[in-house]
């Protein structure tokens, strides 16, 4: 029934037997929490130092302990995979330390810390430093900014409900996606500030009676916010994990929205863009196919990221304070989200950076679908016509065009006059795409002058983002 192959367990004494093989298999997490190993080593070094300051390790013991810990980094992967009998990464690493230092010295490292505060701390450390999501997002934004800068005057049909709405600059549209990604990066920075609090010293839930200094550990491990102010919350809270999962899911959603547009733009019917051969795939049976697989995988992976978030929230929703073993299930979804973004973002960036934009096709469709109707209404308002009347008059112009099978700029002066006495020949000044674009020069608008301001602001924000990402790495 039971299994005990000489492996180290961090609990025992009151147990006469066990654990059963079935329980050991269920409990094992070393196959995924191995990625916390470098942070476990760093945490153990910091813990050894506070044990020394508290008089629980002599100077000689501290020196030997740190020397033993120094030997871990080159061999921790081999150590972790030597046996699956270890319950988790922390057990595996402690086993290795005991083997090298002996039970008398190696066994002292466990004093004053529980896996509860240990895991909560290491998980924060991992998420704060890997996989460099902010830097990868910034690289995608750089590619989008480059796309906008390469096509500053290209007009395209702006859409609502996927129907022609008003002409906009292609650069304006692209920068809208950059803005959304900037908020994702900003969320990461804000999340990091909230997560920069160390649970070390919280123990299992009630804190420590050994005179250890949690503030020293927090400083040693780079937690700018110091140590947790409540030991129960320090060990039991996983809102930082849920928030990180939301940020990754939101980033995935923002990628998916852009991906959907690229897929549509790449169709024969739209022909707005062409994908580079290096960032598209073919068909096993149809030789003419050139498929937008990266964009499609971005859509698919966004669902996966959302699933990781919702699964995590379902795990957390009914946990009483403090720690519960359910929290072992908090890591795999977020590890997966990190991995998915790490592989998706570089490919997506390459796809964007190598897009060929077809200006002629975009500008051909920019005025189509009566997209200048709003300009007629606003021109009338500037002539003193109440907007509701102006709206009706512009709608009547569209109706006339639909009946005649023409576009708004093709209406004659006589037809305009027949629709409304307010429609003088001067209305033609707004019936050009360039005129419509130039008129929307308020902050955030699509006029070239307004888009230039947006571009400058985005680039300034990107400089901040790159600096923060460099600190992150």
Swiss-Prot record:
Family: Belongs to the lyase 1 family. Argininosuccinate lyase subfamily.
Gene Ontology process terms (BP): arginine biosynthetic process via ornithine; L-arginine biosynthetic process
One cellular-component annotation, GO: cytosol
Subcellular location, principal: cytoplasm
Enzyme class: lyase
Species for this entry: Streptomyces clavuligerus
Pathway given in the UniProt record: Amino-acid biosynthesis; L-arginine biosynthesis; L-arginine from L-ornithine and carbamoyl phosphate: step 3/3
Any one GO molecular-function label of the UniProt entry: argininosuccinate lyase activity
Reactions performed catalytically: 2-(N(omega)-L-arginino)succinate = fumarate + L-arginine
Enzyme Commission code: 4.3.2.1
Protein name, UniProt field: Argininosuccinate lyase
Location(s) in or outside the cell: Cytoplasm
A Pfam family: ASL_C2
Cited InterPro entries: Arg_succ_lyase_C, Argininosuccinate_lyase, Fumarase/histidase_N, Fumarate_lyase_CS, Fumarate_lyase_fam, Fumarate_lyase_N, L-Aspartase-like
Protein keywords: Amino-acid biosynthesis, Arginine biosynthesis, Cytoplasm, Lyase
């Amino acid at each position: 029934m039971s299994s005990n192959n000489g492996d180290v367990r961090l609990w025992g004494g009151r147990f006469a037997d066990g654990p059963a093989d079935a329980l050991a298999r269920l409990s094992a997490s070393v196959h995924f929490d191995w990625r916390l190993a470098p942070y476990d080593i760093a945490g153990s070094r910091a813990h050894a130092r506070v044990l020394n300051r508290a008089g629980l390790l002599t100077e000689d013991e501290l020196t030997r302990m740190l020397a033993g810990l120094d030997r871990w980094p080159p061999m921790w992967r081999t150590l972790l995979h030597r046996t699956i009998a270890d319950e988790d990464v922390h057990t595996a690493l402690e086993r290795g330390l005991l083997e090298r230092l002996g039970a008398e010295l190696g066994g002292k490292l466990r004093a004053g810390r529980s896996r509860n505060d240990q895991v909560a701390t290491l998980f924060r450390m991992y998420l704060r430093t890997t996989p460099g999501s902010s830097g990868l997002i910034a690289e995608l934004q750089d590619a989008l900014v480059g796309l906008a800068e390469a096509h500053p005057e290209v007009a395209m049909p702006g859409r609502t409900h996927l129907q022609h709405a008003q002409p906009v600059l292609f650069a304006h549209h692209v920068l809208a996606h950059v803005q959304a990604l900037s908020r994702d990066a900003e969320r990461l920075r804000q999340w990091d500030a909230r997560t920069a609090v160390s649970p070390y010293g919280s123990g299992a839930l009630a804190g420590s009676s050994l005179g250890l200094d949690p503030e020293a550990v927090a400083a040693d491990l780079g937690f700018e916010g110091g140590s947790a102010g409540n030991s129960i919350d320090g060990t039991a809270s996983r809102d930082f994990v849920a928030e990180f999962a939301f940020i990754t899911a939101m980033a995935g959603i923002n990628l998916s929205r852009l991906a959907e547009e690229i897929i549509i733009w790449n169709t024969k019917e739209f022909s707005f863009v062409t994908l580079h051969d290096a960032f598209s795939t073919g068909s096993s049976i149809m030789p003419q196919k050139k498929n937008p697989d990266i964009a499609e995988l971005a859509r698919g992976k966004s669902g996966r990221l959302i699933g990781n978030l919702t699964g995590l929230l379902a795990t957390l929703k009914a946990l009483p304070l403090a720690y519960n073993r359910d929290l072992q299930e908090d890591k795999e979804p977020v590890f997966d989200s990190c991995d998915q973004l790490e592989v998706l973002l570089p490919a997506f960036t390459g796809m964007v950076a190598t897009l060929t934009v077809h200006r002629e096709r975009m500008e051909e469709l920019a005025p189509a679908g009566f997209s200048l109707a709003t300009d007629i209404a606003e021109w009338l308002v500037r002539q003193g016509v109440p907007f509701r009347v102006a709206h009706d008059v512009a709608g009547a112009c569209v109706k006339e065009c639909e009946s005649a099978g023409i576009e708004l700029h093709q209406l004659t002066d006589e037809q305009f006059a027949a629709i409304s006495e307010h429609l003088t020949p001067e209305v033609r000044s707004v019936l050009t795409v360039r005129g419509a674009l130039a008129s929307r020069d308020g902050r955030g608008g699509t006029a070239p002058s307004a888009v230039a301001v947006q571009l400058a602001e985005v680039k300034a924000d990107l400089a901040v983002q790159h600096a923060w990402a460099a600190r992150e790495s």
